[in-house]
């Protein structure tokens, strides 16, 4: 049983997942700070305040604090937009780098490939001249 657990716990996928969770948690703190400390105050200046937490419906002694729910949805949308923009920029940068790497990886054609290309071009010329006649 111990050996099975070791195989499971130290398998590459499990360790990769653990690293991803730790990095994701740290990145989540960065994004939350970006939203809370930078984006929300900027939106608050533009929109004249963005705090819904005090909104509530009161029925006698009971209150439904729906404002906190709306604020949580609003925060989620801002966080989702910030992550979307980050991922979009990241994907654009990585795709440019991958394209450059692909260009560098293309080998020079061998002499045989060059000759085969010339033969192909000659055959195309012959076929097109036959079609005209």
Swiss-Prot record:
Keywords (A to Z) from UniProt: Cell membrane, Ion channel, Ion transport, Membrane, Transmembrane, Transmembrane helix, Transport
A single GO cellular-component term on record: plasma membrane
Keyword Heme listed: no
Domain of life: Bacteria
Annotated protein name in UniProt: Large-conductance mechanosensitive channel
Coiled coil: none
GO molecular function: mechanosensitive monoatomic ion channel activity
Assembly, per entry: Homopentamer.
Role played: Channel that opens in response to stretch forces in the membrane lipid bilayer. May participate in the regulation of osmotic pressure changes within the cell.
Family recorded in the similarity comment: Belongs to the MscL family.
Pfam families with a match to the protein in the record: MscL (PF01741)
Protein encoded by which gene: mscL
Membrane topology note: Multi-pass membrane protein
Locations listed in the record: Cell membrane
């Amino acid at each position: 049983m111990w050996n099975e657990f070791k195989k499971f716990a130290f398998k590459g996928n499990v360790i990769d997942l653990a690293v991803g969770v730790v990095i994701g948690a740290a990145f989540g703190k960065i994004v939350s700070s970006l939203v809370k400390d930078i984006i929300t105050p900027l939106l608050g200046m533009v929109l004249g305040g963005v705090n819904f937490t005090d909104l509530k419906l009161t029925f006698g002694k009971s209150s439904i604090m729906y404002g906190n729910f709306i604020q949580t949805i609003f925060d989620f949308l801002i966080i989702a937009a910030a992550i979307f923009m980050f991922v979009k920029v990241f994907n654009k940068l990585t795709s440019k780098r991958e394209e450059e790497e692909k260009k560098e990886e293309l080998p020079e054609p061998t002499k045989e490939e060059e000759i085969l290309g010339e033969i192909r071009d000659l055959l195309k010329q012959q076929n097109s001249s036959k079609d005209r006649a």
